[in-house]
Regions:
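Glycine- and other small-residue-rich loops at beta-strand/loop junctions that grip anionic moieties
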Residues: 2-5, 61-62, 86-87, 139, ...
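Conserved AMP-binding A3 loop
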Residues: 3-4, 11-40
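Gly/Ser/Thr-rich phosphate-binding loop
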Residues: 12-18, 78-79, 103-108, 117-182
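Short beta-strand->loop structural element characteristic of the AMP-binding/adenylate-forming
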Residues: 24-27, 82-88, 159
Length: 184
């Protein structure tokens, strides 16, 4: 095969929500290093802080046109893992997918948690979620009672983060730290 002259890794172009005006594409410069197999900083973070690797089986219950589902799914692929996509979020369907595919991680929003917590106890108990080691969540503040109930149910696997589509920074808190400072 003939090599392509410029095999630099591409970058995604996400669109802002338009909070401060019209939605616009957030253009990120192409990486300087031409190696397509180089890991970017977000992949390094996902592999380090979140444990994404070749054994990761990631559940994406949200549409890929949103920044977080797209970016986290891309990071799982870059780490060599597997992504399970849901066509549409359904609380019991998410539990069934986690059980069936033995997912190890996923990205959620507080509304997903609320809907899963509203399921009857016997429905929730029907599914084995013991393979989950990382449930990242963002998009809105998670109410203290909801987060506490999720940690009680799934264990200390929740990691909350705050970031922007522009890629200008991120902050994270794991379950252990959150439990010492609820509402953080």
């Amino acid at each position: 095969t003939t090599p392509i002259a410029d095999q630099r890794a591409g970058v995604d172009m996400l669109y802002s929500s338009g909070t401060t005006g019209r939605p616009k594409g957030v253009r990120v410069p192409l990486p300087e290093d031409p190696a397509i197999d180089q890991r970017d900083p977000l992949t390094n973070l996902a592999m380090g802080a979140l444990g994404f690797n070749v054994d990761s089986i990631y559940l994406s219950p949200a549409p890929m046109y949103h920044a977080a589902p797209l970016r986290w799914s891309m990071r799982v692929h870059k780490a060599g893992g597997t992504v399970v996509l849901m066509e549409k979020f359904d609380a019991e369907g998410a539990l069934a997918a986690m059980d069936r595919y033995r997912t190890t991680c996923g990205q959620f929003v507080p509304t997903h948690f609320v809907r899963m917590l509203k399921l009857p106890d016997e429905t929730r108990a029907r599914y084995d979620l013991s393979s989950m080691r990382c449930a990242i969540h963002a998009a809105a503040p998670c109410p203290i009672p909801v987060k506490r109930a999720m940690i009680d149910w799934w264990g200390p696997v929740l990691i909350e983060y705050y970031a922007g589509s522009e890629g200008n920074g991120m902050t994270m808190i794991d379950s252990a730290n959150w439990l010492t400072h609820p509402g953080s």
